[in-house]
Amino acid sequence: LKEEAFILGMDVSFMDEIEQHGGSYRDENGQQEDLLTLLKMGDANAIRLRIWNDPVGGFCNLERTVAVAKRVKEHGLHFLLDFHYSDRWADPANQWKPKAWEKLSYEELQRAVCNYTADVLRTLKEHDALPDMVQVGNEITPGMLWDEGRVSGEEHDTDEQWERFAGLVKYGIAAVKSVDSEIKIMIHIDRGGDNAESRKFYDRFEALGVEFDIIGLSYYPWWHGTLDALRDNLHDLAERYGKPINVVETAYPWTLEQPDGHEWILNQEELLLPGYPASVEGQTRYLKDLLQIVREVPGGLGAGFYYWEPAWIPSKEEWSVGHPNNWGNLTMFDFKGQKLQSFSALKAGLENETEWDEQPNAALIK
């Protein structure tokens, strides 16, 4: 029996593009260092990477993902692969099929999901870079592979559509298990602070027999509510489904300063959580309190978290995703790539590890 470690994760999917264009990172003393090394020195133990089918800019496709995944494995970090099943961002507002799949029938789409998922994982396996965990879809609250797998909006929120959506997800899960049955499956939605919507989603998946290992939630306070709402939701979902839960996307600003030519996604004081200013101290407090909430989930079912793009520094003007960097104040590095003191929150999280290990942790044991 192997106890699963508490995940202190980072999604660094932009790292490849930043490095290729000359961006770099430094430790607290200004010494240049490889990003993965810096993250590991900062107590991160897991990396999440997104994969797009055929992205315009070429980053986050299979070839580039293999190169980065090999580095993740060489650093001895836990690896979560996030399938978007799209050529671009898949999120609650966009779940568009890859261009190559646009004309497929529903049955062909199921086969495409299955074949593509298995091909990606087999390729990673050949390079000794197999993920430990896989997300079948990204923030799939509204379904995925629209419109075949769409469940958002009255017209699509029907039993029949949920069955079609679940059918696509099941083919993805089967493909993962066919390559390596040990890989854990995460199902990820965006409703960190919304218990009613979270229940609705996971109740549907339970009723439809979707078999997965871990609940993944995004939680951005300016979209998803208070930390109390997050805590209440995590507690309820743990008791209701008995599955480990990971807050698989979150972030908080270290500044509201906006360099010329940038417009941050979060740039208004009134969107901040009371008591958590947009400062390195505020960001640190946010992370400490968030990690405490995840650790306190009943039954030891709080499995950890991932910070979304802590290293997406504004190192250049044009990005392969077709829009400017809108995240540069939500990172854990300053605008020039120097590591912030907020990594200390992860260390504080680790110091609780001993008492954590003594808690009943059956659900996290393989």
Curated annotation (Swiss-Prot):
Positions annotated as active site in the UniProt record: 139, 249
GO biological process, one term: pectin catabolic process
Keyword annotations of the record: Glycosidase, Hydrolase
Molecular-function GO term, any one: glucosidase activity
Signal peptide residues on this chain, from the entry's feature table: none
Keyword Cytoplasm carried by entry: no
InterPro entries: Glyco_hydro_53, Glycoside_hydrolase_SF
Family: Belongs to the glycosyl hydrolase 53 family.
Name the record gives this protein: Uncharacterized protein in bgaB 5'region
Organism: Niallia circulans (Bacillus circulans)
Lineage, opening ranks: Bacteria, Bacillati, Bacillota, Bacilli, Bacillales
